[in-house]
C-alpha cells in the first residue's frame, strides 16, 4: 500500500484543528496513525520538513521500519529569522523567498509557483507555514537520530537546491551508516514537482 499522510492542521484541516507545532509531536502523531492502521515494515519517505519528521520517528519507533527515503532534507534545517517573521505576519513574501532560496528558476514552473497554490492566504501563511518553519528551526535531535539509523536509507537531493545545498546533503549522508545518495541535476528543492519521474524511478529502484 502507498499512503500519503496529511498532517493535523495542513490544508483544509486548519479550520478544525491547529497545526502540530514541533517535529517531536508530529512523530508521535504518526505513530498513532500507524497503530490505528496496524502498519509494519514501513518504508517512510519524507521531503524537506518531512525528513526531520521521519528522522525523529525513526529515533523513537524504529521497530516498524524497513527503509527510509529522504528527499531534499538534512538532519537540521535552520530557518532565517527574517523568513520566520514574514510568515508569522502572514506576508506573501515569505512564500516568494522560500521559492527563491529553494530554486532560482521557480518562475519556469508551468502554471506558476506551486507553493503559492497550496498556501494561498495570509492565514495559511501565519497558521501553517510559520508553525512549520518554527518547528524546523527548533528541532535539535537530528544529529543524534541520524547516527542511530539502522535500516537501509536513500537520500535524494536537487543539484540547484539552496535550502538544502549539496554540502549539507553530504554531511547528512555521512551520518547514516547504510545509505546511498542520488543527485538530480537541474533540480531545486521542490524535487517531487520539478523532477517527479526521476525521483519516482530512483525510489522504485531502491
Q: What residue spans do the PLM features occupy?
A:
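Single conserved hydrophobic/aromatic residue that forms the stacking wall/gate
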Residues: 1-9, 14
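Conserved acidic catalytic loop of the alpha/beta-hydrolase fold
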Residues: 25-42
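Flexible "cap/lid" loop of the alpha/beta hydrolase fold
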Residues: 52-96
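Conserved alpha/beta-hydrolase catalytic His-Asp/Glu region
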Residues: 85-150
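Short beta-strand/loop motif that positions the catalytic acidic residue
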Residues: 149, 155-157, 161
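Short alpha-helix in the alpha/beta-hydrolase fold that links the catalytic acid
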Residues: 151, 165-174
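Catalytic histidine-centered segment of alpha/beta-hydrolase-like enzymes
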Residues: 187-200
Amino acid at each position: 500500500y502507498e499512503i500519503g499522510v496529511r498532517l493535523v492542521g495542513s490544508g483544509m484541516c486548519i479550520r478544525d484543528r491547529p497545526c502540530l507545532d514541533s517535529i517531536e509531536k508530529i512523530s508521535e502523531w504518526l505513530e498513532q496513525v500507524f497503530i490505528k492502521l496496524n502498519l509494519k515494515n514501513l518504508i517512510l519517505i519524507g521531503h524537506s520538513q518531512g525528513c526531520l519528521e521521519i528522522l525523529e520517528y525513526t529515533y523513537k519507533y524504529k521497530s516498524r521500519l524497513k527503509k527510509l527515503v529522504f528527499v531534499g532534507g538534512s538532519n537540521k534545517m535552520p530557518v532565517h529569522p527574517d523568513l520566520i517573521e514574514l510568515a508569522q505576519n502572514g506576508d506573501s513574501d515569505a512564500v516568494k523567498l522560500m521559492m527563491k532560496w529553494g530554486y532560482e528558476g521557480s518562475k519556469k514552473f508551468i502554471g506558476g509557483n506551486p507553493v503559492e497554490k497550496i498556501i494561498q492566504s495570509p492565514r495559511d501563511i501565519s497558521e501553517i507555514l510559520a508553525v512549520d518553519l518554527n518547528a524546523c528551526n527548533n528541532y535539535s535531535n537530528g544529529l543524534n537520530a541520524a547516527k542511530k539509523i539502522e535500516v537501509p536509507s536513500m537520500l535524494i537531493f536537487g543539484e540547484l537546491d539552496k535550502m538544502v545545498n549539496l554540502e549539507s546533503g553530504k554531511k547528512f549522508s555521512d551520518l547514516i551508516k547504510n545509505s546511498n545518495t542520488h543527485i538530480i541535476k537541474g533540480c531545486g528543492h521542490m524535487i517531487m514537482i520539478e523532477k517527479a519521474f526521476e525521483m519516482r524511478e530512483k525510489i522504485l529502484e531502491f
